[in-house]
């Protein structure tokens, strides 16, 4: 069986850092935009991947797993309207200081405001759903790679630091591009 991973360097950095932080549990609600991230995690034996097509249920599952294990739990879906279903559980995680890490896959931010489907403004989030929110852009330069590493670390650290809590990582994805594992 051939194994394929995303060529999105920002996603590969995030996956690598998740491993370095010992984050294993991922609840995936795959959609068009986050498929490269989800597929890469599914093909990596390190991760425990749970599938949940309903984003609201996925977020509450993450709260339950984080409560039971005391470990950070990743939830992932597309970053447009689907991610809005995370709000009730993320609010709960915020007030209970649960280490839930929402990774939302987003298409190019330039599409916002041009009547493109599933292209909504994601630059602002509600105050009480995450203690930290970062945007991991596509990487084209060494400086962007450094910024991605810093921001991803910031989010992952904050999920457990000072009592912890939910964090949001918006991952810009260039869809449809995979490469074979060597």
Task: List each model region and its residues.
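N-terminal alpha/beta PP-like core and its mobile active-site loop of ThDP/TPP-dependent enzymes
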Residues: 1-182
